[in-house]
A protein has these predicted regions:
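Low-complexity, acidic/polar, glycine-enriched regions of mature
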Residues: 1-217
């Protein structure tokens, strides 16, 4: 299998990013299932200049609390009006140190660093990931077309590095962690899923409606 491009674009919005803040007085969990991007690598030499990018629209981030969502998206926090998306771009892989190959069905652990773009600020962050190649078969076809790559990536988001901590009110200091934990769980495929736009809209509306019912229950 030569150098291959995998597309992160699940029309069923089953990919996910979870951001957690665990402070002395409060735990906040922020989630989105709207993730798009690309992963390009050589399965026989994963560390040989892989290219990874993904982004999430800030408006899709959800705490489960409407008022908290409004605050989070405002100019004192993520400033969605001026910077509507958060982007991550892999810079380099530092581990494994030598050539490493992906074996179908086996998980490979990698470490590296990438650039996180947030609020108009770009910062380098260390990243750890688990990568699994899933060959094309009847089971994977029920999820996505083509070869499938499952990536679980984790990194930290220090608020001070993105000038967010300075906006926190004194009474918020025990409710928001200074460093947030981010986990992206993504399935990418060599073939782009073909779903009519009206179906995408119905799926998005159904997910939004379900989320609202769960919050109100």
């Amino acid at each position: 299998m030569p150098r291959t491009k995998f597309i992160v674009d699940d029309p069923m919005t089953r990919n996910g990013v979870l951001v957690s803040s665990r402070a002395p007085l409060e735990t906040i969990l922020v989630r989105t299932n709207h993730v798009t991007g690309e992963i390009e690598l050589d399965p026989k030499a994963v560390t040989d200049n892989p290219r990874v990018t993904f982004e999430v629209p800030i408006e899709s981030l959800d705490t489960g609390i409407p008022l908290m969502n409004d605050v989070m998206r405002g100019d004192r926090w993520l400033d969605a009006a001026k910077q509507p998306a958060i982007r991550f771009t892999l810079g380099r892989v530092t581990s494994p140190a030598g050539t490493a190959a992906l074996e179908e069905g086996k998980t490979l652990k990698v470490e590296g660093e990438g650039t996180l773009e947030l609020r108009g600020v770009s910062r380098t962050v260390p990243v750890r990931a688990e990568v699994t190649l899933l060959g094309k078969n009847e089971s994977t076809a029920r999820r996505l077309p083509g070869e499938v790559l499952h990536v679980v990536a984790r990194f930290e988001l220090p608020l001070a590095a993105f000038a967010i901590d300075s906006h926190l009110a004194p009474q918020s200091l025990d409710k928001v962690a200074g460093t947030l934990q981010v986990e992206a769980d993504l399935f990418a495929s060599t073939d782009r899923p073909q779903v009519p736009e009206d179906m995408r809209q119905r799926l998005a509306a159904a997910r939004k409606s379900l989320g609202q019912r769960l919050v109100g229950s």
